[in-house]
């Protein structure tokens, strides 16, 4: 594929941006077109609630949008989408298919890979998960002293942690009757020590989530958990009742002491950051129940169908992707804020920090050339309204343009005080996107200061600080209620957005070689931390840091 910057559609957009972008004023666009909201929004009726994508507060008009869609077509987005759903090996550097969509293929249509339908295997694992969940949640599965399981501890990292953690937090209202759930990921001993302090070994079930069963952080934490467990249980055979594995490495699982019957399989065509739909989601299913887990899958499948079948100009993931391309490659934006106005979604931005930055944080194209354009953004965010009292100042009046996605449910899970809390939350959500779009003109600020009784001197002094330029772009994503189905659809929408951007940038969104170098060096450094002798095998900074650690580690501090 030719470089993006040499693409005729890209060049057309670049010329248009140079000539006209200064004239794109959101206030004026809304004044000129009273129907702008209707022209630049999608209302997706999932039959399990609505998802409204309002992208009218973006720095685009119909002409720009048309050119962006042409860019997507010229970069082969439609063919690439079809190739992914068809099981072709689009992860070129690892020679793998990318089939997380098969994990939630609720239509159960055949999905062929290397001439074989993957669906029978997918359904077999789902059936095994369902049966296991029913046994644990009903109390039929007993620990070594005959007690039912009260606590699930998921030990994993990256994709084996972030997805299940985010979803179990988001779906807490649906967890009635299920065990409590804990997540241990960090190799920092504090994480597992503080978690184990809350647990009773007689009623704890550990899920060890590692595809290879060799991930250093995960296996170290798992061994620590097993050691803690055996201090109480004594008998190694009791491990089989309290440890299960999500892995593909049967030998390592057996070696650990886990019965292979309690190993839940997934496949190399499931990328870590797309794996919550697989056996990696076992902690979700145990916590909220398998029926709710199936609804999560169904919501994602609904969005898969929308992505597959809807024309690009009415396609929610495609539109989100193209708006991101517009800001990154034409306005020079470097970050993207995800701002969910729902406390249950407090890990949503962190989840897509991995989803986006590990997928599209690449500077090499599929053919091995270095890009001469920007690729994946820095993704960050916190729940509203907390963020309003923290970092929104920079979004409103800082020197950087930060495109934002605002997300909110119309209905709350907790309509306390007759819905007062949620009404205030909704009002703040609506006010922020309007304020970022409209800003406050010098004339409006002057009138406000005059009405507040400021003297002419005070007014002139304060006036520049009270002006908001506005014209800050946002998407509003409003959905009926945060249910398992709607959450599944929202996650899939962002997954496909990331995929589309990767295709336009001509990068492989499904490998993560950048994770490897640090891991390799850590293995070399670890033995060098033993003993007191000076280390000289690295650069002076790394040598100096190792020396400082060796000097300080035995220092007594009160």
Swiss-Prot record:
Active site: 358, 389, 519
Originating organism: Rattus norvegicus
Keywords: Acetylation, Cytokine, Cytoplasm, Gluconeogenesis, Glycolysis, Growth factor, Isomerase, Phosphoprotein, Secreted, Ubl conjugation
Residue numbers carrying N-acetylalanine: 2
N6-malonyllysine modification, residue list: 454
Descriptive protein name: Glucose-6-phosphate isomerase
Domain of life: Eukaryota
Oligomeric and partner information: Homodimer; in the catalytically active form. Monomer in the secreted form.
GO cellular component: ciliary membrane; cytosol; extracellular space; plasma membrane
Compartment(s) where it occurs, according to its Swiss-Prot or TrEMBL record: Cytoplasm; Secreted
InterPro entries from the UniProt entry: G6P_Isomerase (IPR001672), G6P_Isomerase_C (IPR023096), Phosphoglucose_isomerase_CS (IPR018189), SIS_dom_sf (IPR046348), SIS_PGI_1 (IPR035476), SIS_PGI_2 (IPR035482)
């Amino acid at each position: 594929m030719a470089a993006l910057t040499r693409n005729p559609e890209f060049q057309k957009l670049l010329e248009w941006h140079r000539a006209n972008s200064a004239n794109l004023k959101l206030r004026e666009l809304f004044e000129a077109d009273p129907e702008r909201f209707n022209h630049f929004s999608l209302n997706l009726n999932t039959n399990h609630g609505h998802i409204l994508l309002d992208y009218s507060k973006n720095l685009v008009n119909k002409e720009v949008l048309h050119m962006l869609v042409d860019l997507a077509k010229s970069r082969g987005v439609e063919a690439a989408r079809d190739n992914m759903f068809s099981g072709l090996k689009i992860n070129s550097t690892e020679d793998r298919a990318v089939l997380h969509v098969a994990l939630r293929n609720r239509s159960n249509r055949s999905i062929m890979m290397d001439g074989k339908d993957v669906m029978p295997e997918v359904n077999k694992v789902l059936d095994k998960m369902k049966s296991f969940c029913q046994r644990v949640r009903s109390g039929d599965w007993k620990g070594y002293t005959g007690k039912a399981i009260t606590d699930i501890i998921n030990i994993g990292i990256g994709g084996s942690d972030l997805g299940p953690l985010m979803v179990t937090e988001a779906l807490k209202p649906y967890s009635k009757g299920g065990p409590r759930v804990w997540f241990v990921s960090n190799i920092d001993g504090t994480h597992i020590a503080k978690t184990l302090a809350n647990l009773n070994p007689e009623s704890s079930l550990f899920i060890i989530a590692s595809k290879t069963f060799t991930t250093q952080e995960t296996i170290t934490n798992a061994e620590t958990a097993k050691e803690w467990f055996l201090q109480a249980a004594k008998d190694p055979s009791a491990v089989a009742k309290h440890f299960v594995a999500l892995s593909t490495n049967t030998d390592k699982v057996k070696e650990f002491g886990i019965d292979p019957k309690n190993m839940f399989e997934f496949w190399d065509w499931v990328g870590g950051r797309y794996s919550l739909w697989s056996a990696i989601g076992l902690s979700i299913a145990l916590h909220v129940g398998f029926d709710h887990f199936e609804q999560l899958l169904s919501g994602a499948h609904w969005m898969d169908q929308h992505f597959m079948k809807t024309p690009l100009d009415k396609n929610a993931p495609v539109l989100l992707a193209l708006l991101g391309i517009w800001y990154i490659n034409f306005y020079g934006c470097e970050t993207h804020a995800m701002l969910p106005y729902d406390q249950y979604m407090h890990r949503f931005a962190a989840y897509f920090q991995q989803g986006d930055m590990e997928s599209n944080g690449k500077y090499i194209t599929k053919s091995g050339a270095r890009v001469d354009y920007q690729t994946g953004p820095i993704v960050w965010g916190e729940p509203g309204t907390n963020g309003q009292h923290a970092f929104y100042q920079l979004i409103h009046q800082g020197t950087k343009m930060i495109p934002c996605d605002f997300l909110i449910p119309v209905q709350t899970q907790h309509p306390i005080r007759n819905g007062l809390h949620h009404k205030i939350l909704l009002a703040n959500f609506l006010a922020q996107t309007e304020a970022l779009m409209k800003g406050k003109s010098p004339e409006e600020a002057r009138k406000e200061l005059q009405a507040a009784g400021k003297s002419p001197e005070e007014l002139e002094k304060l006036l520049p600080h009270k002006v908001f330029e506005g014209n800050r772009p946002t998407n509003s994503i409003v959905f009926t209620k945060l249910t398992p189905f709607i959450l599944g659809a929202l996650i899939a929408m962002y997954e496909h957005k990331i995929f589309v951007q990767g295709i336009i940038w001509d990068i492989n969104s499904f490998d993560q070689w950048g994770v490897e170098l640090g891991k390799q060096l850590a293995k070399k450094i670890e033995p060098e931390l033993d003993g007191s002798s000076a280390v000289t095998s690295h650069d002076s900074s790394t040598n100096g840091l190792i020396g400082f650690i060796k000097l300080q580690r035995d220092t007594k501090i009160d």
